[in-house]
Amino acid sequence: MLVFGLDPGLNYTGWAVVLKEPSGSLSLLDTGTICTTSCSDLNDKLFCIFSGLSAIIQKFSVSVASIENVFVNLNPKASMFLCYARAASLLACLSSNVKIFEYSPTKIKKCVFGNGRASKEQIAFVVRSSLGLSEDASFSSHASDAIAAALCHIFSSGNRYGI
């Protein structure tokens, strides 16, 4: 099973491609963050997210995506911008016929860490240990959250040991 994990954001969109082998072993094929801070225009940011994710989808031939649901922020404008980034992310998936699974941030944390209130550091630790990565493995918190989204789908789709 190949899963495309997404952590959408207007300035930083994390992504990850995680493979679960039939044996149950997990591999991180690639991960990264699409940074749009150099774009001053909202439309440019959205196009950058869409085109960047579309290229990754094509490169890895992904057919399943796991994405964080929107959470309500105290700042309505921030929530609105997050929705724009999610829309660009969803459109990239839909335009390539990628099946989308959505999970709340709490569900992702609970599924991956066992606690829905896990910190970014705790999630990063579990992500590294689940994938057999060293403590030196470096990626952004956005990429870590995208990996966690992919792992959540894998763990929710059956036993992580392939039994």
Curated annotation (Swiss-Prot):
Free-text comment on the cofactor: Binds 2 Mg(2+) ion per subunit.
Q: Pfam families this protein is in?
A: RuvC (PF02075)
**Residues where Mg(2+) 1 binds:** 7, 142
Q: Give GO BP annotations, semicolon-separated.
A: DNA recombination; DNA repair
The Enzyme Commission number assigned here is 3.1.21.10
Question: So where does Mg(2+) 2 get bound?
Answer: 68
| Sample GO molecular function, one term | magnesium ion binding
Cofactor(s) required for function per UniProt: Mg(2+)
One cellular component (GO) term of this entry:
Holliday junction resolvase complex
User: Where does this one sit in the cell?
Assistant: Cytoplasm
- Gene3D superfamilies, sorted: Ribonuclease H-like superfamily/Ribonuclease H
**Principal location class:** cytoplasm
Keywords on record: Cytoplasm, DNA damage, DNA recombination, DNA repair, DNA-binding, Endonuclease, Hydrolase, Magnesium, Metal-binding, Nuclease
Show the catalytic activity.
Endonucleolytic cleavage at a junction such as a reciprocal single-stranded crossover between two homologous DNA duplexes (Holliday junction)
Annotated active site = 7, 68, 142
As for family, the record states:
Belongs to the RuvC family.
What is the protein's quaternary organization? Homodimer which binds Holliday junction (HJ) DNA. The HJ becomes 2-fold symmetrical on binding to RuvC with unstacked arms; it has a different conformation from HJ DNA in complex with RuvA. In the full resolvosome a probable DNA-RuvA(4)-RuvB(12)-RuvC(2) complex forms which resolves the HJ.
Q: What does this protein do?
A: The RuvA-RuvB-RuvC complex processes Holliday junction (HJ) DNA during genetic recombination and DNA repair. Endonuclease that resolves HJ intermediates. Cleaves cruciform DNA by making single-stranded nicks across the HJ at symmetrical positions within the homologous arms, yielding a 5'-phosphate and a 3'-hydroxyl group; requires a central core of homology in the junction. The consensus cleavage sequence is 5'-(A/T)TT(C/G)-3'. Cleavage occurs on the 3'-side of the TT dinucleotide at the point of strand exchange.
Q: Can you name this protein?
A: Crossover junction endodeoxyribonuclease RuvC
Organism the protein comes from: Anaplasma phagocytophilum (strain HZ)
Gene encoding this polypeptide? Answer: ruvC
